[in-house]
């Protein structure tokens, strides 16, 4: 018994309809293929691809031209050229390629190899590598009205004048000039499809951004020929993306400059100022060797980053020279140099106040008692308290004056010295002529005590001399510190102004 399921019946009917319609479809396809074959024979049977597609030789072929950019591949600053991947949109009318669609199976368009038809010899005038014309001959799209639409792709290396003054914040203006190489304006004339470059299919570059891309129509008479030749020139305004160079060039330079400033904050006693300067200079030299390939190698102008690197190099070199001078001042002493009066007045008095530097007090003045200071007179063993007691006892000593004179008269004169009250020693010969009122307080001492007191005097003089030398040395050290502080602030200001000078010109030019 045959199956009666509705689905089975549906598939049976569909199969029968396919068998009935397939011959008609195949016949129609065969007719379309046959019509396309007939159309090819009709169009290219007696077609001459070398002749201009005009009925009269005086007619002008109007070529509508447009440009679409797919990728900005590279901008070579050293070789002064721009590499782009573009599509050349060209459209013209060929009266020999017209047909009636009704006679050829309603075929309204046809795609044919571009080698079979006449095409305009549009080339890139400012080419930089020898490939002036299109190398990949794609198919052209023909329409029954005779309109030919041809969009070949091409990779061009065009000459471009690169201005790297504001590198890496630079903006370039490159052009691509297209025109017929052999036909003048009386044979071929150009029209722009669009006034701007088509950016719909543009693939963004990681280094450059297209700010503007416009085209202009020009007619020019060259020295070689009497005819006028038309061209369409496209101007690309491109701006460099500075992030890569900011991270790899500018920030390291700023850090090196900061290290140079810190040299003047490092104390001279540590002995590492010159080491730090040389280390910074060596690091900058190695850094310059590494970035030689990054900076555009051109002698037309000095790039902004090159000026900043040169500024940093001079900056570091000057810091070394100044550091050597500061160390020389720091280690001066009274035995080698005398401090001029203007240095004492300016660098020990006025300049520290301007720099807000407060010199700490000496330890004797900071911690000592007022009653324990040494006196510069011959009473150097006395204290202020002793001096007051001495003044109080002067009257008592005057009363004992006669008795002391009597005691001195009975002692030998040749081997004794005298000691004034409270330890003041005078070496003199004693005799009858010494018995005067001014010598009433003299006390005779033995030679051993005299030698001991002479030794004490020598030690005291030596200590005073060392104290004076130490004071002068401390003054020289403080002068070195003041000079360090002067150049610290000076280098901070110069570093700040140099950094502002790096960013301000491109900012004012609208490139940042």
UniProtKB/Swiss-Prot annotation:
Cytoplasmic side of the membrane: what ranges? Answer: 330-485
Q: Which InterPro entries match?
A: Neur_chan_lig-bd, Neur_chan_lig-bd_sf, Neur_channel, Neuro-gated_channel_TM_sf, Neuro_actylchol_rec, Neurotrans-gated_channel_TM, Neurotransmitter_ion_chnl_CS, Nicotinic_acetylcholine_rcpt
Q: Which residues are glycosylated?
A: 56, 106, 212
Q: Which residues lie on this side of the membrane: Extracellular?
A: 28-241
Q: Which reaction does it catalyse?
A: Ca(2+)(in) = Ca(2+)(out); K(+)(in) = K(+)(out); Na(+)(in) = Na(+)(out)
> Could you provide one GO biological process annotation from this protein's UniProt record?
cellular response to nicotine
Major place of residence:
membrane
User: Membrane topology type, per the record?
Assistant: Multi-pass membrane protein
By sequence similarity, the record places it as follows:
Belongs to the ligand-gated ion channel (TC 1.A.9) family. Acetylcholine receptor (TC 1.A.9.1) subfamily. Alpha-2/CHRNA2 sub-subfamily.
Q: What is this protein called?
A: Neuronal acetylcholine receptor subunit alpha-2
What is the organism field in this record? Mus musculus (Mouse)
């Amino acid at each position: 018994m045959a199956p009666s399921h509705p689905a089975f019946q549906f598939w049976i009917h569909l199969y029968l309809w396919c068998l009935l319609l397939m011959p008609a479809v195949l016949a129609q396809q065969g007719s379309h293929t046959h019509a396309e074959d007939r159309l090819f024979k009709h169009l290219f049977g007696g077609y001459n691809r070398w002749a201009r597609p005009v009925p009269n030789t005086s007619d002008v072929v109007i070529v509508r031209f447009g440009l679409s950019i797919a990728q900005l591949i590279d901008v070579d600053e050293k070789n002064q050229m721009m590499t782009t991947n573009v599509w050349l949109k060209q459209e013209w009318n060929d009266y020999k390629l017209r047909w009636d669609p009704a006679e050829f199976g309603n075929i309204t368009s046809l795609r044919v190899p571009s080698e079979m038809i006449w095409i305009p010899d549009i080339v890139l005038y400012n080419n930089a590598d020898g490939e002036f014309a299109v190398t990949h001959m794609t198919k052209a799209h023909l329409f029954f009205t005779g309109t030919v639409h041809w969009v070949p792709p091409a990779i061009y290396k065009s000459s471009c004048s690169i201005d790297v003054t504001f590198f890496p914040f630079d903006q370039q203006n490159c052009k691509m000039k297209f025109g017929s190489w052999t036909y003048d304006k009386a044979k071929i004339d150009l029209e722009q499809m669009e006034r701007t470059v088509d950016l719909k299919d543009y693939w963004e570059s990681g280094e450059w951004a297209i700010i503007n891309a416009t085209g202009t129509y020009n007619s020019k008479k060259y020295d070689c020929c009497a005819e006028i030749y038309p061209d369409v020139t496209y101007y690309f305004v491109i701006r460099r993306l500075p992030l890569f160079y900011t991270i790899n060039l500018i920030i390291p330079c700023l850090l090196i400059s900061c290290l140079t400033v810190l040299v003047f904050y490092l104390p001279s006693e540590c002995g590492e100022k010159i080491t730090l300067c040389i280390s910074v200079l060596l690091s900058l030299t190695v850094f310059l060797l590494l970035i030689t390939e990054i900076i555009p190698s051109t002698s037309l102008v000095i790039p902004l980053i090159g000026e900043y690197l040169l500024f940093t190099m001079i900056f570091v070199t000057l810091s070394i020279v100044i550091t050597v001078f500061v160390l020389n001042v720091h280690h001066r002493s009274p035995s080698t140099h005398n401090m001029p009066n203007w240095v004492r007045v300016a660098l020990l008095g006025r300049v520290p106040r301007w720099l807000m530097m407060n010199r700490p007090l000496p330890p004797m003045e900071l911690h000592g008692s007022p009653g324990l200071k040494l006196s510069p007179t011959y009473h150097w063993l006395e204290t202020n308290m002793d001096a007051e007691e001495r003044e109080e006892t002067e009257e008592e000593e005057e009363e004992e004056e006669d008795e002391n004179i009597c005691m001195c008269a009975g002692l030998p004169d040749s081997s004794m010295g005298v000691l004034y009250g409270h330890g003041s020693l005078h070496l003199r010969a004693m005799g009858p002529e010494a018995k005067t009122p001014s010598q009433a307080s003299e006390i005779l001492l033995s030679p051993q005590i005299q030698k001991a007191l002479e030794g004490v005097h020598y030690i005291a003089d030596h200590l005073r001399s060392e104290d004076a030398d130490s004071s002068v040395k401390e003054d020289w050290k403080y002068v070195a510190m003041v000079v360090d502080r002067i150049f610290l602030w000076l280098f901070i200001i110069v570093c700040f102004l140099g950094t502002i000078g790096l960013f301000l010109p491109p900012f004012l030019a609208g490139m940042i």
